[in-house]
Amino acid sequence: MHFIAISINHRTADVALREQVAFRDDALRIAHEDLYETKSILENVILSTCNRTEVYAVVDQIHTGCYYIQRFLARAFGFEVDDIKAMSEVKVGDEAVEHLLRVTSGLDSIVLGETQILGQIRDAFFLAQSTGTTGTIFNHLFKQAITFAKRAHNETDIADNAVSVSYAAVELAKKVFGKLKSKQAIIIGAGEMSELSLLNLLGSGITDITVVNRTIENAMKLAAKHQVKYDELSSLPNLLESADIVISSTSAQTYIITNEMIERIAENRKQDSLVLIDIAVPRDIEPGISAITNIFNYDVDDLKGLVDANLRERQLAAATISEQIPAEIHAHNEWISMLGVVPVIRALREKAMAIQAETMDSIDRKLPGLSERERKIISKHTKSIINQMLKDPIKQAKELSSDKKSNEKLELFQNIFDIEAECPHEQAKQQKESKVKEISARRIFSFE
């Protein structure tokens, strides 16, 4: 069995292509089932976000498995197989495990160290698990990856520092006010940066937010989308009298907020602090306003300095997390190697306990007068003898897990003890056959 990961992401395809290869949420369960029913696939998890579409799979053959996954993606989105090959990257074995660990911990994200991907990986795994397309390997590996990512984030605080301008804007406001939940905010503009700033304000706990824009329809649309207030740009002077935070991002060629405007409203603000954050180029807020008492004015250069410093902190944290990945891969490989040993040990124990049971039956027939106490003592001691006899063989079997010729030696081990253990590959194939029947039955039932 082999583990492969096929990824279409921000490095391999531009956003125009990524938009065309994203699964709708309501189509993912069927997609999991369709892929699982494909030849060569033994387990699979599909991850589909705005920045990546990835298929993780356990396959019986690498080349065949890759082809059928690429064909599955091509058919799902109306591409040729060669198109999918050109826009994706393929990871196999240890590289695939490393890829999953890096993705889950945010090291492979556009925004280094972001935590949203962890939840998305978890949701993808849970969906696959509930659909029935995961088995022994992925049930272990994905839990390991999720646990690793949680620990990495907790130990390094990689996600604590803002590395986007819109997020940094909110962080600056926090430096002035501390908690923002009770504050009033104004968003000037209705474009992409304004929406990102609005989302970050909502994420900080602020609910009293007003969107203002030169075109009132655009302000109305953005406000309705996020259930906040809106107003005309001409109302800005009045709104400023009670606002605590203003984030401005327009394409205006003249200042939206001037020194004169702030001086006029400052008299009515009773020395309350006002944070003005200008993320527009050219600037929306006239320079020099910060000279007025309790007015804090930041422009895009101030934000860039904060973002750059925070990015350096994240890069250091990312390096620390990366150093931990080889140990995780090693732990996974050790666990995988034990998969072939466990059935052998189980078969050996079962045979030994069967012999012990036969021996006790023979003793019962030959010594029918034994009391229950005497019988328990004999049973206990025969089991103890068996455990002592099995101790060294079991130890040797476990050591074979790391041997390069483990399969051959485990087969010899089974021949010596005259036992037969089912290999993990056969178990996986049987498990798949059973689950495919369940999926087919489920579909027939749904159709009826």
Curated annotation (Swiss-Prot):
Site (Important for activity): residue numbering on this chain: H99
Enzyme category, top tier: oxidoreductase
EC number in record: 1.2.1.70
Pathway assigned in UniProt: Porphyrin-containing compound metabolism; protoporphyrin-IX biosynthesis; 5-aminolevulinate from L-glutamyl-tRNA(Glu): step 1/2
Domain of life where this protein originates: Bacteria
Binding site for NADP(+): G189, A190, G191, E192, M193, S194
Binding, substrate: T49, C50, N51, R52, S109, E114, T115, Q116, Q120
Entry's Gene Ontology BP terms: protoporphyrinogen IX biosynthetic process
Single annotated GO MF: glutamyl-tRNA reductase activity
Catalytic center residues: C50
PROSITE patterns: GLUTR (PS00747)
Assigned protein family: Belongs to the glutamyl-tRNA reductase family.
HAMAP family from the UniProt entry: Glu_tRNA_reductase
Function: Catalyzes the NADPH-dependent reduction of glutamyl-tRNA(Glu) to glutamate 1-semialdehyde (GSA).
Other facts: During catalysis, the active site Cys acts as a nucleophile attacking the alpha-carbonyl group of tRNA-bound glutamate with the formation of a thioester intermediate between enzyme and glutamate, and the concomitant release of tRNA(Glu). The thioester intermediate is finally reduced by direct hydride transfer from NADPH, to form the product GSA.
Domain notes: Possesses an unusual extended V-shaped dimeric structure with each monomer consisting of three distinct domains arranged along a curved 'spinal' alpha-helix. The N-terminal catalytic domain specifically recognizes the glutamate moiety of the substrate. The second domain is the NADPH-binding domain, and the third C-terminal domain is responsible for dimerization.
Subunit composition and interactions: Homodimer.
PANTHER family on file: GLUTAMYL-TRNA REDUCTASE 1, CHLOROPLASTIC
Protein name: Glutamyl-tRNA reductase
